[in-house]
Design a protein with these regions (language model features):
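Class I SAM-dependent methyltransferase Rossmann-like catalytic core
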Residues: 1-18
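Conserved alpha-helix/loop element of class I SAM-dependent methyltransferases that forms part
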Residues: 15-34
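Class I SAM-dependent methyltransferase SAM/SAH-binding core
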Residues: 37, 43-93
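A short acidic, Gly/Pro-enriched loop at the edge of an enzyme's catalytic core
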Residues: 95-104
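A short SAM/SAH-binding and catalytic strip from SAM-dependent methyltransferases
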Residues: 103-116
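A short glycine-rich, Lys/Arg-flanked "PGG" loop and its adjoining helix->strand segment in the class I
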Residues: 118-132
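Conserved class I S-adenosyl-L-methionine
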Residues: 134-158
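Core SAM-dependent methyltransferase catalytic element
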Residues: 175-191
Length: 191
């Protein structure tokens, strides 16, 4: 199942909306993270910078084989060998990763999914105790150049509430990622 309203513009247009390294830094994805799971690689906008940062592997998933192929070519161009690609529907089938196996989960521009709690619960399941989830989404403003329609676009407070309902604990306030996005960082409390 594809995420509603998730059509992608041309790669250059998409990439112009983000400063990936700055966003990853603000969301706490550092070299202290070993393994990362990314829910939806898209063009690899965040996959490639994440792979350059972490000491382990970025496990990236997407339902669209074109997105997987595009990101794979980009990884090859930069000679990145620490990315594991998986084509599949992680919403209905999960990631296929063992529970508690990654340090960080990336949910970027995907939380408007029809079942955000299921998506967040799968991210929670994947994380080690003490691991973090980074959420990035379009701000709740109809003038943004892209993003899902306003009737399905979550406000930051709604995304935060869903994450708390899924079991996460906030690590920070809502993070401004101008000009078009906001971010959240939450953790799976150690048990």
């Amino acid at each position: 199942m594809k995420v509603r309203e998730s059509g992608m513009p041309p790669p250059d247009t998409w990439d112009a909306y983000f400063e990936p390294d700055s966003i990853l830094s603000k969301l706490g994805l550092t070299s202290a993270c070993h393994d990362v799971v990314e829910f939806g690689c898209g063009y690899g906008t965040f996959t490639i910078p994440a792979a350059r940062r972490v000491t382990g592997t970025v496990f990236t998933l997407d339902i669209d084989e074109v997105m997987i192929a595009t990101t794979r070519r980009c990884a090859e161009r930069f000679d990145l060998r620490n990315i594991n690609f998986k084509l599949g529907d992680f919403v209905t089938g999960g990631t296929g990763r063992p529970s508690g196996s990654v340090d960080y989960a990336m949910l970027f521009n995907i939380i408007h999914h029809e079942q955000p709690l299921n998506l967040l619960r799968e991210a929670y399941r994947n994380l080690k105790a003490g691991g973090s989830v980074g959420i990035v989404h379009w701000i709740y403003d109809a003038t943004t150049p892209r993003g899902p329609p306003m009737d399905v676009r979550p406000r930051p407070e709604q995304s935060l509430q869903w994450a708390i309902e899924a079991g996460f604990t906030p690590k920070s306030d809502i993070i401004a990622l101008p000009p078009y996005h906001y971010g959240l960082v939450l953790s799976r409390i150690k048990k």
